Amino acid sequence: MKSLFVAGTGTDLGKTHVACALLEAARAGGLSVDAFKPVVSGFDPDAPDDSDPARLARALGRPEAWTDVSPRRYRAPLAPNIAARLEGDTLQMDDLITDCREWLIGRDVGLALIEGAGGVMSPMTDEATNLDLMVALGLPVLLVAGSYLGTASHLLTALEVLRARGLSIAAIVVSESLDAPDLDQTLGLLRAFEHQATILSAPRAGNWDAGSLVDLLMA
């Protein structure tokens, strides 16, 4: 089983967009897949179909499985620890790690994705960040960046931090940002500074085919 952690250089850059496209392309290629997002904030229980868990569940071909995809769901569109506190919960990193490990143990699929919340250093609990969860799990990272002005600094900083903590980068996907500079120009800039991991792009126009990403990750 190929297991990956889908992380972002920031918030709302397209992690779920990339993860869904990857899952759909993998399924189209005959792979069995599953996905897990251990905690999500900004979740409206009255409109679950628009949520990240529901999008991932649809990409899995199991649209009713969003409760399994994300067992910890909070309403407020804030950092998970703050959103949880508003509902009387306190998130603990040990619990999130256990959730992810138990989920991984129970999988028997070709490709399993765990998607984080926010960016690499986004707080997950009152004392720990997304990075702490990633380090504890030790999975290769599929890193998603935007194409906005300033993304080079954010991406290179994230790569430096991830590698300093011993994490490997499976691939980098640049998810096209709205009203951003030319995508190809941005890709050229990023590739001039990052020579280890393959950088692919995920255009927003049309339906992005992630088949090349599947081939790269499963090789």
Swiss-Prot record:
Pathway: Cofactor biosynthesis; biotin biosynthesis; biotin from 7,8-diaminononanoate: step 1/2
Sites where the protein binds ATP: 12-17, 52, 115-118, 175-176
Cell compartments where the protein resides: Cytoplasm
InterPro entries from the UniProt entry: DTB_synth_BioD, P-loop_NTPase
The UniProt record lists the keyword Magnesium: yes
Catalytic reaction list: (7R,8S)-7,8-diammoniononanoate + CO2 + ATP = (4R,5S)-dethiobiotin + ADP + phosphate + 3 H(+)
Catalytic residue positions: 37
Residues the record lists as binding substrate: 41
NADP among keywords: no
Enzyme Commission code(s) on record: 6.3.3.3
Annotated positions binding Mg(2+): 16, 52, 115
Cofactor: Mg(2+)
Signal sequence bounds: none
GO cellular component, one term: cytosol
Molecular function via GO: ATP binding; dethiobiotin synthase activity; magnesium ion binding
Gene Ontology biological-process annotations: biotin biosynthetic process
Superkingdom per UniProt: Bacteria
Keywords: ATP-binding, Biotin biosynthesis, Cytoplasm, Ligase, Magnesium, Metal-binding, Nucleotide-binding
Sequence similarity: Belongs to the dethiobiotin synthetase family.
Classification via NCBIfam families: bioD
Subunit structure and binding partners: Homodimer.
Function description: Catalyzes a mechanistically unusual reaction, the ATP-dependent insertion of CO2 between the N7 and N8 nitrogen atoms of 7,8-diaminopelargonic acid (DAPA, also called 7,8-diammoniononanoate) to form a ureido ring.
Protein name: ATP-dependent dethiobiotin synthetase BioD
Organism encoding this protein: Caulobacter vibrioides (strain NA1000 / CB15N) (Caulobacter crescentus)
